[in-house]
Each structure stands twice: as C-alpha cells, then as structure tokens.
Amino acid sequence: MLNKAGIAEPSLWTRADAMKVHTDDPTATMPTIDYDFPVMTDKYWVWDTWPLRDINGQVVSFQGWSVIFALVADRTKYGWHNRNDGARIGYFYSRGGSNWIFGGHLLKDGANPRSWEWSGCTIMAPGTANSVEVFFTSVNDTPSESVPAQCKGYIYADDKSVWFDGFDKVTDLFQADGLYYADYAENNFWDFRDPHVFINPEDGKTYALFEGNVAMERGTVAVGEEEIGPVPPKTETPDGARYCAAAIGIAQALNEARTEWKLLPPLVTAFGVNDQTERPHVVFQNGLTYLFTISHHSTYADGLSGPDGVYGFVSENGIFGPYEPLNGSGLVLGNPSSQPYQAYSHYVMTNGLVTSFIDTIPSSDPNVYRYGGTLAPTIKLELVGHRSFVTEVKGYGYIPPQIEWLAEDESSNSAAALSLLNK
C-alpha cells in the first residue's frame, strides 16, 4: 500500500511478532564470551564500531590496510557507565582485519559544533582516490539536539600506518520534523541518530537509514489492533505500551555531495513493541532486502521481553518493503540468558560477518563483573530466505576486507573484490 507521497506505508513490528521472541533460541543466540577476553586498547573504552566501506556496503582495504571506526572515550577520564559523556569517533587500522592499532580521533578538535560524536558510518567517496565521508550523529545535551551530520576528509597510508586529514567542517544533514519522526517537543525521550548511507540497487539513488520514533506526542495514543496483531484470546496489552514507539527511518539524498536530504516516511515502526531500533543497516542478497537493527531488553514495551541483540526484517520488494520479521519474531542474534549484557551494537556486514562490542561479562562470583569496552568475537550469520542462522565464531574483532579500494572507478573495485575472494 502506498501513501500520498507514493511511498509504501511503514511495515509494523507487532506485539504478536514480538511474542515469538525466545531468549536462548539455539539458531539465534550469540555464544558466550569468556571472562578472560583480550582488550584491543587499555587507553580507550571502545563501543559502537563500523568498518570503512564503499557506498554499496562492502568492507574496504586501503593500500593493504583495513580500517575501522568506533566510539571511544578516555579510560582515565570516564568510567564505563558515563563513557557517552566523552564520546568521539576514533579509528583503528590493521593488516588483514585483526590486531587493531589505534590511530587517533577522526574529526579535528572543535570540528563538531556540539558536545558528542555518536554512531554512523564511513564511506570511500565513489570515484575518488582517497576521499572519505563520515556520517555520524552530532549530539548536544543542553539544548537537546541529535542531528545526523557529515564530515569530509582524506585517507593516507604508507608501509607503517594509516592517517587522515581534513575532517574539520561538519555539515548538518536533516533533523526530526515532528511529521514523520518525533522531535523533542513531542517526545523528550526521542531518538534521532545513527545514519547509515547506501545506494539502493533497485533505483540507483542514495539513501540513509536512521533511528527515529513515531511522530506523536508521547503516551497520548493507544496501541491499536494493527500494532497488536493476531494474538491469542484474552491477551491484554498493558496501558504503558503506548510509551514505546520506535521507528526505522529513511531519507533520500538530493545531490551528489550527499549534503542535501529529504525525509521519507519510516520503513518499519514498533509502536507498542519497543522504544529503540538503533543503528539500522541493510544487506541486499539474493533478491531480498534485509533490514537489521539493534535493541535492548530494557526498551521493550510492557508485557513483552527479548534479549539485547540484533533484530531483523526482510522484504521481497526492495528497500521500501513491505517487511516481515526475520524468523517470524524479528530476533536474529541475542545474548544468552547466562550473560544477558555480554555484547551489544552488532553490525551485520554484507558477507554475513557480525561485529559487536563487549559490554559486561559475569565471573563465577555473581557479584563480580568485568566491563568490556573492546570488540567481541565476530559471528558468522547465514541468511536463507526469511530465516537466519548462527553458524560460526571467528576471532575477537575480526573484520576482514571484502575489496581493495582502487581509485580509478567502481568497475575496478569490483575486479578487486573478485581478486580478494580468490585469494
């Protein structure tokens, strides 16, 4: 069904769908992480992480170096629980996608006009030799602001290291409009962040996914029958469910510089189900569109429950859907009940590898925990139609390249991808 703008109406993640979520499902549960995990750097907390990639989603190697980006905070200044107060985007590099070396902060000091740098994505600018664009969330506490933004610069490398230049001017891209997506006036618990930029293979246009909330005054609308879905007889929906209204949003780029954007209606909404659908991203495979997001146990609506982890939706009709929850419930990769907070902020790459960061690992003493702030073991995910399966555990922080970036054109990068696959 299309709305007046000619865009498909949002697909619904219903309460009936979420009732099928089961923690410890063996095909959708992350294996337990050992208490004695290694730390990639003892100077910085590391959490939300994403690779350097092309605009089509493939992980890029630049002059033989793999590069990843992460939110980081100085361990000597911030504790694990207040790390967001010092959040900046840092970068790491390695040969082959493991044993990462910290390179520094990406943005120049003072470039961000707001207090914090939160999650997004980083791409090689198409058709360029070494131009890089980071899309991130520029965040302020007072006044409350959360703005998807862009910053541009250049990547350089030699035999010893990788470094960046530029990244000294931030451009705001779009803001919550109160029409498609709740703004602060409508919902002071609003979410509007985590831009993920990509080219849609169906129409060749550039879009950005992001986390948002359904546009409405928080708590003023009752959860309807469509949002509830086909539930068993006598199933009651708690009144408090109306306070949860997550949405996976999308915007369309209006120029080649990717600095001007138009907001479109949400792709998926979770009104009455969950209040957060963070870091949405997309994988196109075998004619299907897989939409992934992450969410918390703590953000589920009253009367529902599920683990921290990855949730997903699949469309047989391209990026605008309609979507159905993967595995019937939406759960793709959850934490085990024995370690419910072991990992978070999973990112599913186009090769099926899933990276995340370690959060909190319990010891044999139930009163003793170890905070992570480092990358978790990488998981291999198999996507088969409307189902997903956990199949392998790789090394800690293993993020290998899929293509070698070549400056000439996109066709040469396709050839480089085949070369890497054949190695």
Curated annotation (Swiss-Prot):
UniProt catalytic activity: [6)-beta-D-fructofuranosyl-(2->](n) alpha-D-glucopyranoside + sucrose = [6)-beta-D-fructofuranosyl-(2->](n+1) alpha-D-glucopyranoside + D-glucose
Alphabetized GO MF terms: levansucrase activity
Site (described: Transition state stabilizer): 194
UniProt effect for mutating residue 278 to D: 30-fold decrease in kcat for sucrose hydrolysis. KM for sucrose and transfructosylating activity are only slightly affected
Any one GO CC term of the record: extracellular region
Keyword Metal-binding belongs to the record: no
EC number: 2.4.1.10
GO biological process terms on file: carbohydrate utilization
Disulfide bonds: none
Job of this protein: Catalyzes the synthesis of levan, a fructose polymer, by transferring the fructosyl moiety from sucrose to a growing acceptor molecule. Can also cleave raffinose and stachyose, but does not cleave 1-kestose, nystose, levan and inulin. Also displays sucrose hydrolase activity.
Name under which the protein is recorded: Levansucrase
Organism the protein comes from: Zymomonas mobilis subsp. mobilis (strain ATCC 31821 / ZM4 / CP4)
